[in-house]
Curated annotation (Swiss-Prot):
Protein species of origin: Stenotrophomonas maltophilia (strain K279a)
InterPro entries, alphabetized: ATP_F1_dsu/esu_C_sf (IPR036794), ATP_synth_F1_dsu/esu (IPR001469), ATP_synth_F1_dsu/esu_N (IPR020546), ATP_synth_F1_esu_C (IPR020547), ATPsynth_dsu/esu_N (IPR036771)
GO MF entry, a single one: ATP binding
Its membrane topology: Peripheral membrane protein
Protein name: ATP synthase epsilon chain
Function field: Produces ATP from ADP in the presence of a proton gradient across the membrane.
GO annotation, cellular component aspect: plasma membrane; proton-transporting ATP synthase complex
Amino acid sequence: MSTIRCDIVSAEQEIFRGEATLVVATGELGELGIAPKHAPLITRLKPGKVVVTTPNGEQLDFAISGGILEVQPQVVTVLADTAIRAQDIDEASVRKAKEEAERILANRGEAMEVAEAQQKLAEAVVQLQALERLRKTLKH
């Protein structure tokens, strides 16, 4: 079985480095599936999840707040603004951040404050979705 090296990095740290048989992420135009020997490409990533399928069939879920995906024939790199492994998500903190962002949006503060709240809300939703998917996987 052929593999492709996958690197997922954020501004703070390297989140994942390893071999994969498939990497799935959400680009600006929709969902992308990157397999070994994929044609080179660069695209923006929307906030969402990145799913890495390892050679043993395990699926690893990551939540990202957006970024860039670079694909070369032997390596796929996710350069995320922020990224976190699904199992590392602190649900209570994420829910609190989501509620705070919703409060700011409801009060319609300054334009910059609203833009930041929208970004934080998008990140919180993505993290909660990744956490829910992880829980469903663990139940099976």
